[in-house]
């Protein structure tokens, strides 16, 4: 019997002397059947009588069953459970967790009424887990009770010997009883050789530091299973990753260093690395950037290549500007090209070739706005229209040239062209592109001329309706690229944070990891400090880890292997930036936050280059190093119009510059800002560089739907003495916002503004502040609660003028919702509105109304699409920023 379940059964024995009936007893069999089915009141009555009578006969004790009693069928026994037993069980959990500030009696009271239809101890656990998760509205530590139960269950059903777990994974059999090892022979042998050292280092108690959603995320997709049963603990996963990265050099010190900081939550590697480390197919890379040829043979080859990459959990970006337009002449067959209609097949492939059965396949397609099929492209994800002309599972992106933005601004003409007629436009950017574009225009080699502003409106219309296309500024990307000596960057990846050179023969790759920034905040005597030295150290560890992945990775294609070994790019990002600002009790766009933002990314960039320089001394530079900006002593911030007086002074950049000039670097690119959607759930922090979307929201797991509340906000409101159920209802009523709640001080409201309440100008400026230290780019979303052409245009132009490489990842608009979607019933809503004098809120956003105003907005408008004499100061980020 496992240790946790014995807690309950020991207490059962204390409450009553219930003895099992003989298995052949007709009454017993009937009662068990009824208990299992729990279909009628008779079940309770029969069980009650059986339990009482048997107890009386066996012990000669007049047993009075408490009023709050339920009946549990466990291993063929009839058991009596009371609220006191539940309380004792919860109390023991509190003792083991050393929790003293939570209310045992209140939790017991909330649990017991739910136990009317249970038949196993697991059901009791599930109700306690559910109750603990719901009680996050009382205190953010209640869900830790749920984690304790879940993790104890996992530990009871898995081995605390890492070798035993490894043996199970290595000796796995298929359904046909053939050998089907989950981990590789080399990994297994290494574990077997060093198991004593490993078992001394591994710390299973750290499993309990996960949040409930972190555990649920690992449980669903990451922890290894045999016959659908989990056999791996989180610490096994972290050790498996650490061993994979360093075992080939027999480097136990680096293995244990990586394990230590990974298991303590200082960083995490990307999802494919967590999925596949140590397995028979170690595909550890996150991003693949592809080019494509224009012939049918090359296109069909690309279909196969995409399927193979997606099969092994890689996200894909494909630049397809070179695909000739629909109706273009094909000399070999005297036929006509299908143009970008080929994307409907890519859409089907993405649906079929999912990522190892764990995540849907994901493809992003990039073209430039001069392509003749641009309007067809922009309609691909729309909800209306013929299904044969839609590809709603693809993600769409634009590589926008500066000349297009200039023509939109001037309300000038724009020429659409076919790449087969204008081949000199391909692989060009900046002045060279403009020169060729103007030449083709002057010669009349274009398909059609339109107002640039008409296309711009069409782009924004698609973004407002579907959230895409992404906006990448091609000239900014290439002007500031450390790979410019290799070639021109023509596309990006699935999430718009990777910008690497690729073509139909050379597919680029990137390996990612993210640093959990809140782990570097220490609060001493209520004064927060940020440990930049530790951040520097972690950046160096990750640089070496990611560099190792390049060498050990399983590559689905030679095109990916050759390019990655040649250019060796990596991507170190972050998560939990908003958590850091909350811990510092400073608003997201304050000067303190901006200073932290700059220093954090300067430190990561400095640490990454320092370690890459050390790696170059050990193994040599990457093959295409010579001729790169970094080989000439130019850092990323040297490629920007950057005021070096804004450097923190913490790091000796000139010394590092000289070391790099002397010895080079091992990696062509090192820093990025990826979304961290899944890994942020695991580590328990806010996503990436994003502000909080809401301070309270619901999240679905396999165990049900629970509320998540910003724990920093709860802590601050507890300190103010205003955290109570009424406050929770008000935050739910306002859909996660605290802006309109009267008894919250203004300084707290400023700290906990949601992304809908923070000016997008601030989001863009924060991105621009860190950009000189990000040599790839950033997954920067725009958040506009009720999108309009004017507001969206203003943001996009401001991002362009700030020199950002990514102008927009997704456009996020606020979904129409009501308070009852946040767990408040209609009567409660009416009560809140009446008590607080709130007028009924209306959420109205009609895309049709927006679209119908397009002709009115175009006339006489340039930047914000509002005539200058009607525009208020500060309305337009682009003009006034």
Swiss-Prot record:
Q: Where is this site: Important for electron transfer?
A: 809-810
Name the positions where substrate binds: 271, 286-287, 315, 493-497, 675-679
What EC class is this? oxidoreductase
Active site positions, chain numbering: 493 (proton acceptor), 495 (cysteine radical intermediate), 497 (proton acceptor)
MF terms in GO: ATP binding; ribonucleoside-diphosphate reductase activity, thioredoxin disulfide as acceptor
Q: How is its activity regulated?
A: Under complex allosteric control mediated by deoxynucleoside triphosphates and ATP binding. The type of nucleotide bound at the specificity site determines substrate preference. It seems probable that ATP makes the enzyme reduce CDP and UDP, dGTP favors ADP reduction and dTTP favors GDP reduction.
Question: What PANTHER family has UniProt attached to this entry?
Answer: RIBONUCLEOSIDE-DIPHOSPHATE REDUCTASE LARGE CHAIN, RIBONUCLEOSIDE-DIPHOSPHATE REDUCTASE LARGE SUBUNIT
Name of the protein described by the UniProt record: Ribonucleoside-diphosphate reductase large subunit
- Which species is this record about? Acanthamoeba polyphaga mimivirus (APMV)
């Amino acid at each position: 019997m496992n240790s946790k379940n014995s807690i309950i059964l020991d207490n059962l024995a204390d409450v009553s002397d219930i003895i099992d009936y003989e298995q052949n007893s007709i009454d017993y069999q009937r009662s068990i059947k009824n208990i299992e089915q729990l279909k009628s009141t008779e079940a309770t009555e029969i069980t009650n009588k059986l339990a009482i009578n048997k107890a009386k006969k066996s012990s000669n004790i007049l047993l009075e069953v408490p009023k709050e009693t339920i009946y549990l069928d466990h291993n063929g026994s009839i058991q009596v459970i009371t609220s006191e037993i539940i309380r004792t069980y919860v109390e023991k959990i509190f003792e083991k967790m050393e929790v003293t500030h939570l209310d045992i009696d209140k939790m017991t009271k909330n649990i017991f009424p739910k136990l009317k239809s249970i038949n196993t101890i697991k059901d009791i656990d599930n109700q306690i887990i559910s109750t603990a998760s719901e009680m996050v509205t009382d205190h953010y530590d209640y869900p830790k009770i749920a984690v304790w139960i879940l993790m104890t269950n996992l530990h009871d059903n898995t081995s605390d010997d890492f070798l035993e777990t490894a043996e199970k994974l290595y000796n796995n059999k298929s359904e046909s009883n053939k050998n089907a090892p989950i981990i590789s022979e080399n990994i297994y042998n290494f574990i077997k050789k060093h198991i004593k050292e490993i078992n001394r280092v591994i710390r299973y108690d750290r499993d309990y530091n996960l949040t409930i959603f972190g555990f649920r995320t690992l449980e669903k997709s990451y922890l290894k299973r045999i016959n659908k049963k989990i056999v791996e603990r989180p610490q096994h996963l972290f050790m498996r990753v650490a061993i994979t990265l360093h075992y080939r050099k027999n480097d136990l010190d680096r293995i244990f260093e990586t394990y230590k900081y990974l298991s303590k939550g200082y960083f995490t590697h990307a999802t494919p690395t967590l999925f596949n480390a140590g397995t028979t197919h170690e595909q550890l890379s996150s991003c693949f950037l592809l080019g494509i040829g224009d012939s049918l043979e090359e296109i069909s080859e690309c279909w196969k290549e995409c399927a193979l990459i997606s099969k092994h959990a890689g996200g894909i970006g494909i630049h397809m500007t070179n695909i000739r337009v629909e109706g273009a002449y094909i000399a070999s067959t005297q036929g006509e090209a299908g143009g970008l209609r080929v994307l409907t097949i890519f859409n089907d492939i993405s649906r079929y070739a999912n990522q190892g059965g764990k995540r849907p396949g994901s493809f992003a397609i990039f073209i430039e706005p001069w392509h003749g099929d641009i309007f067809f492209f922009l309609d691909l994800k729309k909800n209306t229209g013929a299904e044969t002309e839609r590809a709603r599972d693809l993600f769409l992106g634009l590589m926008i040239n500066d000349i297009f933005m200039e023509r939109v601004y001037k309300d000038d003409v724009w020429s659409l062209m076919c790449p087969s007629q204008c081949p000199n436009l391909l692989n060009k950017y900046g002045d060279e592109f403009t020169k060729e574009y103007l030449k083709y225009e002057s010669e009349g080699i274009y398909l059609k001329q339109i107002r640039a502003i008409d296309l711009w409106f069409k782009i924004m219309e698609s973004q407002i309706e579907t959230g895409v296309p992404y906006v990448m500024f091609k000239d900014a990307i290439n002007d500031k690229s450390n790979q410019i000596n290799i070639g021109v960057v023509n596309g990006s990846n699935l999430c718009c944070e990777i910008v690497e050179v690729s073509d139909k023969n050379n597919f680029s790759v990137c390996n990612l990891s993210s640093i959990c920034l809140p782990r570097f905040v220490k609060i001493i005597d209520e004064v927060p400090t940020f440990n930049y030295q530790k951040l520097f150290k972690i950046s160096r560890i990750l640089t070496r880890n990611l560099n190792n992945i390049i060498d050990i990775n399983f590559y689905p294609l030679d095109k990916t292997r050759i390019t990655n070994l040649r250019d060796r790019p990596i991507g170190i990002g972050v998560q939990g930036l908003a958590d850091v600002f909350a811990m510092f009790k400073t608003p997201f766009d304050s000067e303190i936050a901006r200073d932290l933002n700059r220093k954090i990314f300067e430190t990561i960039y400095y640490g990454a280059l320092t370690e890459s320089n050390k790696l170059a001394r050990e193994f040599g530079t990457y093959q295409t190093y010579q001729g790169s900006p970094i080989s000439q002593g130019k850092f990323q911030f040297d490629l920007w119009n950057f005021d070096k007086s804004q450097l923190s002074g913490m790091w000796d950049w000139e010394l590092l510059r000289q070391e790099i000039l002397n010895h080079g670097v091992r990696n062509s690119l090192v820093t990025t800002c990826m979304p961290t959607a899944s890994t942020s759930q695991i580590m328990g922090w806010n996503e990436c560089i994003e502000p909080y979307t809401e301070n309270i929201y619901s999240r679905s797991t396999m165990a049900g739907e629970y509320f998540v509340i910003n724990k920093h906000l709860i802590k601050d409101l507890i300190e103010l003495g205003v955290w109570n159920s009424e406050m929770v209802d008000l935050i739910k009523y306002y859909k996660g916002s605290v802006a309109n709640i009267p008894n919250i001080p203004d300084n707290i409201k400023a700290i906990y503004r949601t992304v809908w309440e923070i000016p997008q100008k601030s989001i863009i400026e924060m991105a621009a502040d860190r950009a000189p230290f990000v040599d790839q780019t950033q997954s920067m979303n725009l958040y506009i609660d009720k999108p309009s052409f004017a507001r969206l245009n203003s943001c996009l132009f401001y991002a362009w003028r700030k020199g950002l490489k990514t102008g927009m990842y997704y456009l996020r608009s606020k979904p129409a919702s009501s308070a009852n979607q946040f767990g408040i019933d209609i009567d409660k809503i009416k009560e809140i509105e009446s008590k607080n004098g709130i007028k009924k809120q209306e959420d109205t956003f009609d895309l049709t109304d927006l679209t119908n105003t397009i002709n009115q907005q175009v006339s006489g408008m340039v930047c914000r699409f509002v005539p200058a004499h009607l525009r208020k100061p500060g309305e337009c980020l682009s003009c006034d920023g």
